[in-house]
Amino acid sequence: MKVMTFNVQHCLDYQNQIIDIPLFADFIKEQNVDICALNEMRGEGNWEGYTDQTNALGDSLSCNRYFAEAIKVVGTNPYGNALLTRYPVKSAETVHIPDPDERTEDVHYEHRCALRAVLDVDGRDVLCVVCHMGLAKSEVAFAVKTVCQILDESTLPAIVMGDFNHTKDSGMLTPLFERLSDADELCERAGIYTFPSYAPREKIDYILYRGFKCESCRVIEKIVSDHFPIVAELTVE
């Protein structure tokens, strides 16, 4: 099966700086993936442009979907992570990540969540986790702990995807790499960067897995969002 992770930045066409859901629907369709993890998605809100992007993409692609709301921008406009998939969704939930008690780092702080879903992949249950981690080290520590708890509570084959906002050598993600393999190890171009798409200089987007064999992995080097997506082909062991 093919899986993709993509920070879509509100479905903002990076080239033209307008919200363009059909552009993203067509791009995702081109990749022909079975599971697609999306970060920075909007839900139906009161502001102009805050529409239900998950259902719009899901309807366009004729696939199952789930939206995990992390926050409401200015109290009325949902924003979070989403999962699109051709497989039946047996269960899905939004797991909120604890916020740090103190905000001492000079970065933007934001409440985060993880999307937890169990999919029926050809008769076998597979755990999927989608997460967009914070910029502050204290935020990432809570996010990593939360995702590890989700993983440790299950024995299912698992895929963890998303924009983690930190590189592998930062050390912040080590507990995840102790539990999971990184599809990047089979990337067609070793060390390929995912951000920013207009001048890539770091890899902060990931497809991690357990209970699978990774057959291939590649970064799609096309400027649609401010991130490049990653696509990997996995087979259940």
PLM region descriptions:
Residues 1-35, 59-60, 64-67, 73-237:
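Active-site regions of metal-assisted phosphoester/phosphodiester hydrolases
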Residues 18, 47-51:
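Generic alpha-helical scaffold signal
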Residues 39-46:
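Active-site neighborhood of divalent metal-dependent phosphoester/pyrophosphate hydrolases
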Residues 46-47, 106:
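Short consensus segments that form the blades of beta-propeller domains
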